């Protein structure tokens, strides 16, 4: 049994948590493609994307699907997860979030092809899917 009083346990801490720090410091990291010259697809699903509507401030939820054909670099998955988590408190539209993710992804790994699909959870009886593409 803990000696902590309920008041102590429920007090919000001003200390930055390690996960928050990793998200804030996160950037897309890449490593060398182990099979340069071989054309293959990498499919990534990120089911916990969140951001905030720039008009209402309400949270938006989406599953982000990234499919790409690597050239010389491959994206490291933990770094990608932290990058995606950095959108949590950003006020950004569905359209801009999908485009920004693609722009940053292409800048990081310069793939031969990339596709980002943002499938947003319906809100107010509206279901939005934004799909953007890049071809080298």
From Swiss-Prot:
Keyword Oxidoreductase found: yes
Location of this chain's protein in the cell: Cytoplasm
Keyword Cytoplasm: yes
GO cellular component: cytoplasm
Family: Belongs to the GTP cyclohydrolase I family. QueF type 1 subfamily.
NCBIfam families in the cross-refs: QueF-II
Role summary: Catalyzes the NADPH-dependent reduction of 7-cyano-7-deazaguanine (preQ0) to 7-aminomethyl-7-deazaguanine (preQ1).
Protein name: NADPH-dependent 7-cyano-7-deazaguanine reductase
Lineage: Bacteria, Bacillati, Cyanobacteriota, Cyanophyceae, Nostocales
Gene: queF
């Amino acid at each position: 049994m803990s000696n902590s009083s309920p008041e102590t346990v429920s007090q919000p801490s001003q200390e930055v948590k390690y996960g928050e720090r990793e998200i804030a410091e996160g950037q897309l990291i890449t490593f060398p493609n182990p099979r340069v010259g071989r054309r293959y697809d990498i499919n990534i699903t990120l089911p916990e994307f969140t951001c905030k509507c720039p008009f209402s401030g309400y949270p938006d939820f989406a599953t982000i699907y990234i499919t790409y054909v690597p050239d010389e670099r491959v994206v490291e998955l933990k770094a990608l997860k932290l990058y995606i988590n950095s959108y949590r408190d950003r006020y950004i539209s569905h359209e801009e979030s999908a485009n920004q993710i693609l722009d940053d992804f292409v800048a990081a790994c310069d793939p031969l092809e990339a596709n980002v699909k943002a499938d947003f959870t319906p809100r107010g009886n509206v279901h939005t899917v934004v799909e953007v593409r890049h071809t080298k």
